Amino acid sequence: MSRGLGDVYKRQPVPYTVKVAYSGTKLSGTESSEAKILSFVFDKEVAAVDSLVVGDVVINEESKTITFMVADTAKAEYLTALVPTIEVSEKATVTPASGVAQDFSNGKTVTYTVTAENGTTVEYVASISGNASFYDFESWSYGSTMYPEEQDCPILNGWACCNDAVLLIKKMGALGGITYEGEYPVRPSTDDVHAGEKALLLESVDTKGGNIFGTPVPKVTAATAFLGTFNAFGALGGDPMATTSFGVMYDKQPLKVTGFYKYTPGAEFYNANGELQAGVADKCSLSAVLYEVSSEDETLNGGNIYTSDKIVAKAVFTNDKAVESYAPFELNLEYVKDYDSSKLYKFAVIFSASADGASYNAAVGSKLLIDDVTIINK
């Protein structure tokens, strides 16, 4: 078949010159692909409302979630402008940016996109996981409702303790031939803290033993602090358990109590009769109890706080070994009944340097330090 010149010309390649203009950053192939949120914190120095965040922020790399707790007193309007400070992988960027206020109120979530140096992106979802109460034991006052003229009795604001019982021994002990001029068992520690300037110090003290008008005075008064109320005169009827009313009204479902503690058991352990018990070791007790009530006046005391059929959930930790440096503790409440938000509850957190101190069994000098306690609610 013959071909014309036109066919030949059609089949000849035609050279072209193409010019490409690059914009942006040219990648070398060695750029980092890491796109992580390394730190996500709330600093009250950055924004006052950030002080509503309590405890540690949890960054879960597997689920790519960021969760944190807020104070149980936090109102929704205050949670609309929390300001996280964010640190990401080197040369990565994050959107929304660090230091920008975000709305975490009413269950809202905020999605953060981290872009690596090479353009790889990873998303994290941040949200409030629950609310909590935080106690740093920095707030103390001094005095007594029983004896207003006494100005040296430590009061742990927001908590009850056994100091009034020791004050009563100081004021009335002479009537039973008892003289006690030592320290109060519950007082602030300023030279041994986990954080801040103060911690809660509980030290079981030697109150000599005996009786005042027939009311027993223990050889050792165990140091105890708790959420609830303490009535030193309750023991005048002969029942030391009647001094404690454990728990405060609580409209949330507590899940666990965390914090830090140190412990030194005393060397000499005495029973309720004031007899030295050779070879018996004291132990500290840290506990939490949620129980149902029919009214605000109903309460559990030292005789039934761990045994009542009113108990809905509890956690108890004891230790008879020395803990020389602050160690974390975690009281996970075990529920024996279903929680019902329509019912009334009281919640008690109890710290004691001597676990059986309510029965007057304790060691002189047993010392428990507590700091930075958080009650975490559902």
Regions found by a protein language model. Give the residues of each.
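Predominantly extracytoplasmic/ectodomain segments of secreted and cell-surface proteins
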Residues: 10-128
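Single conserved hydrophobic/aromatic residue that forms the stacking wall/gate
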Residues: 1-12
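Extracellular-facing segments of soluble proteins and assemblies that are Gly/Ser/Thr-biased and enriched
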Residues: 206-296
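Residues within well-ordered beta-strands of beta-sheet-rich folds
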Residues: 136, 256-262, 287-289, 328-334, ...
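Short carbohydrate-recognition loop motifs
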Residues: 190-210
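Extracellular carbohydrate-recognition regions
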Residues: 129-174
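Extracellular carbohydrate recognition and processing domains
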Residues: 295-342, 363
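Extracellular carbohydrate recognition
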Residues: 341-344, 354-377
